[in-house]
C-alpha cells in the first residue's frame, strides 16, 4: 500500500508551519493505526505519505493479506474526516491517493541505522506500487489486477468486490501516467476501487 496526500505543498504554504506539522502528525498517526489494526506493517513515512506491507505469512493467506490491504485503505480514507476536523479543515481539503499492489517476490526486512529502525521491501513490485499511487490522481485508489486476483470468494464478498467484473486499464496508457510510470510499470493492469 502506497498512500500520499495530494496537494500537500500548496497546503503547507497556506497553513502555518506548526499547523501543517500537526496535520502531518495526525495523518501519520491515522495511517499507522489503520495499517496496524488491519494486520499490516508500516514501512516508512515520507512527509505525509505512507508505505505499508501486508504479508500473507502474518495475515494468514494471500487473500487475507489482500483483504487487509484494501480494508486499511478504506479505513484510512474514512479517517480523513477526523484528521481534517482536528486540523480545522474541511475533508475536501485533504485528498489521499492510493496505490495498491501485490508482490510475490518481495524481500521484506528491517533496516536499523544509528538507532533508527525501518521496515522496507525490495523488488520490482515496490517500484510498480509507487507508480500506481502516483497515477491515482484526484484522490483515487488504483489497485493492481494481481492484488485483486489474490482475493478468494469470501474475502471478495466481504469487501463487496467481484473480481470477475472488474475492468482494468494498463498503467502506461493512463492519462495520468508520467515518464516513471511508463518506464517502470507500463504493462501493470489496474482498476479503480
Where do the PLM segments sit?
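Intrinsically disordered, glycine/charged-rich C-terminal tails and inter-domain linkers
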Residues: 106, 117, 128, 137-193
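A generic structural signal for short hydrophobic patches within well-formed alpha-helices
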Residues: 8, 50, 59, 147-148
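Hydrophobic alpha-helical membrane-association signature
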Residues: 20-27, 68-72, 76, 125-128
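Catalytic-site or vestigial catalytic-site microsegments of nucleotide-handling domains
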Residues: 1-10
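Conserved long alpha-helical elements within nucleotide-processing catalytic cores of c-di-GMP signaling
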Residues: 9-32, 43-44
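Catalytic core of nucleotidyl cyclases, primarily class III adenylyl/guanylyl cyclases
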Residues: 3, 34-67, 82-124
Amino acid at each position: 500500500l502506497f498512500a500520499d496526500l495530494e496537494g500537500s505543498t500548496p497546503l503547507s504554504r497556506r497553513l502555518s508551519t506548526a499547523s501543517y506539522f500537526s496535520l502531518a502528525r495526525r495523518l501519520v498517526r491515522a495511517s499507522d493505526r489503520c495499517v496496524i489494526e488491519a494486520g499490516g506493517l508500516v514501512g516508512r513515512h515520507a512527509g505525509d505519505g505512507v508505505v505499508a506491507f501486508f504479508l500473507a505469512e502474518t495475515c494468514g493467506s494471500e487473500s487475507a493479506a489482500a483483504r487487509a490491504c484494501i480494508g486499511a485503505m478504506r479505513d484510512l480514507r474514512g479517517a480523513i474526516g477526523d484528521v481534517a476536523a482536528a486540523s480545522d479543515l474541511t475533508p475536501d481539503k485533504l485528498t489521499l491517493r492510493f496505490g495498491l499492489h501485490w508482490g510475490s517476490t518481495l524481500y521484506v526486512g528491517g533496516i536499523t541505522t544509528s538507532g533508527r529502525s525501518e521496515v522496507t521491501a525490495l523488488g520490482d513490485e515496490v517500484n510498480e506500487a509507487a507508480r500506481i499511487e502516483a497515477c491515482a490522481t484526484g484522490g483515487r485508489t488504483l489497485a493492481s489486477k494481481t492484488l485483486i486476483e489474490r482475493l478468494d470468494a469470501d474475502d471478495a464478498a466481504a469487501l463487496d468486490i467481484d473480481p470477475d467484473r472488474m475492468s482494468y486499464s494498463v498503467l502506461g496508457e493512463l492519462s495520468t501516467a508520467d515518464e516513471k510510470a511508463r518506464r517502470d510499470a507500463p504493462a501493470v493492469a489496474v482498476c479503480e476501487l
